[in-house]
Amino acid sequence: MTQKLHIKTWGCQMNEYDSSKMADLLLNTHGLELTDVPEEADVLLLNTCSIREKAQEKVFHQLGRWKELKKQNPSLVIGVGGCVASQEGEHIRSRAPYVDIVFGPQTLHRLPEMINQIRGGKSAVVDVSFPEIEKFDRLPEPRAEGPTAFVSIMEGCNKYCSFCVVPYTRGEEVSRPVDDVLFEIAQLAEQGVREVNLLGQNVNAYRGPTHDGGICSFAELLRLVASIDGIDRLRFTTSHPIEFTDDIIDVYADTPELVSFLHLPVQSGSDRVLNLMKRNHTALEYKSIIRKLKKVRPNIQISSDFIVGFPGETDQDFEDTMNLIAQVNFDMSFSFIYSARPGTPAADMPDDVTEEEKKQRLYLLQQRINNQAAQFSRAMLGTEQRVLVEGPSKKDIMELTGRTETNRIVNFAGTPNMIGKFVDIKITDVYTNSLRGEVVRTEDEMGLRIVQSPQVVINRTRKEDELGVGHYQG
């Protein structure tokens, strides 16, 4: 009888990526098939996030539900991973002793051995260590699910912003070797992936080792990925302004596959608050990056992260943030009310902004950005937009849906052979959360750039050393 795996994932795209790798890994090693129904599962995994308020309590609340399943099925294996697991470690088992496995983001590749230990009679396994890049060497080959894919290029962060737990939960910055990244992306391209989103807590800090002992910069990696035939749309997230260097901006000038959309977190428009946050840049320096980008990509659209109500934030500080939002003209944002994260420097600061003030500021900020986004959408009316077709529309199964390079959903009448390909759409209607249009050009008529086939990259990168690690032979 086939055994089942259920994974519940909270948090960022990196967590989503990690969960997909866990599923592939345990399918390969234990034949565990994914199920959406926890009651059917033989293994339950909770991949946690510690960014939001009361993250720990949310974890234990979920585990309380799973406790009942464990009572009904004592052989059920329960594991907790992700950033809360990394933070809490053994404490998770002291509050929830029915949890069998606690693992961190850097030890998920050891799950097969951990499960075997539990099934072999061991009472519990806790491993929240930071074995650097080892996990990528032990994960299965990538498996495409549709025309878009996420690829992790690095882990961790060295910036130690005063409000952030990432350096403590995912460790310091470690970059994957460039050959490993290219090999994974070429394999995905062979399976029909057309858009790749490069992932990391701070992707523009990427410094990947090369086969000859050199270092590949993030700008160089972008060009290498874009040169793989089939990868005709390239994104990355998330970046830090202090490492958004001119060589990255140059890639926007000469690499058409890199989308005209950038997520660049700023958090605040007040230099005083930015200093308290230990962001190590000013609002003016942030605007300088945007100005340089718009010089080479006039139509580029920018999204960002904002924290409102940071300790000590005054009305003037918030007004500075609102001014920055207007000046940059952000298209979208991920914006949140500040809440202290245990163990961070900001947690020791007096949280002196009232809850009512925080809510009001968040409302005003989101309203401003939503209005700006609506203006961008209305400006698309009558224009042609290149869309990557993802599949049937959720609104009408007789239609297709896809996304523009600025991540707007477009619904249109099309044929099944368009799925997984690009089409140019003339926008005829603009709605609150989507666009509608008509096909004016199919992929065969576009003349997309061809540099090197995925198979060429695969053949070139499948040079393994004595540890079984491939090396890019450029």
From Swiss-Prot:
Documented EC number(s): 2.8.4.3
Residue intervals of the MTTase N-terminal domain: 3-120
Reactions listed under catalytic activity: N(6)-dimethylallyladenosine(37) in tRNA + (sulfur carrier)-SH + AH2 + 2 S-adenosyl-L-methionine = 2-methylsulfanyl-N(6)-dimethylallyladenosine(37) in tRNA + (sulfur carrier)-H + 5'-deoxyadenosine + L-methionine + A + S-adenosyl-L-homocysteine + 2 H(+)
The TRAM domain, residue ranges: 378-441
Keywords carried by this UniProt record: 4Fe-4S, Cytoplasm, Iron, Iron-sulfur, Metal-binding, S-adenosyl-L-methionine, Transferase, tRNA processing
Main location: cytoplasm
GO CC field: cytosol
GO molecular function terms listed in the Swiss-Prot or TrEMBL record: 4 iron, 4 sulfur cluster binding; metal ion binding; N6-isopentenyladenosine methylthiotransferase activity
Cofactors, names only: [4Fe-4S] cluster
Cofactor: how and how many bound: Binds 2 [4Fe-4S] clusters. One cluster is coordinated with 3 cysteines and an exchangeable S-adenosyl-L-methionine.
Positions of [4Fe-4S] cluster 1 binding: 12, 49, 83
Alphabetized InterPro entries for the sequence: Elp3/MiaA/NifB-like_rSAM (IPR006638), Methylthiotransferase (IPR005839), Methylthiotransferase_CS (IPR020612), Methylthiotransferase_N (IPR013848), Methylthiotransferase_N_sf (IPR038135), MiaB_methiolase (IPR006463), rSAM (IPR007197), rSAM_horseshoe (IPR023404)
PROSITE patterns reported in the protein's UniProt record: MTTASE_N (PS51449), MTTASE_RADICAL (PS01278), RADICAL_SAM (PS51918), TRAM (PS50926)
Positions annotated to bind [4Fe-4S] cluster 2: 157, 161, 164
Subcellular location: Cytoplasm
Assigned protein family: Belongs to the methylthiotransferase family. MiaB subfamily.
HAMAP family to which the protein is assigned, alphabetical: tRNA_metthiotr_MiaB (MF_01864)
Cited function: Catalyzes the methylthiolation of N6-(dimethylallyl)adenosine (i(6)A), leading to the formation of 2-methylthio-N6-(dimethylallyl)adenosine (ms(2)i(6)A) at position 37 in tRNAs that read codons beginning with uridine.
Name by which UniProt lists this protein: tRNA-2-methylthio-N(6)-dimethylallyladenosine synthase
Gene responsible for this protein: miaB
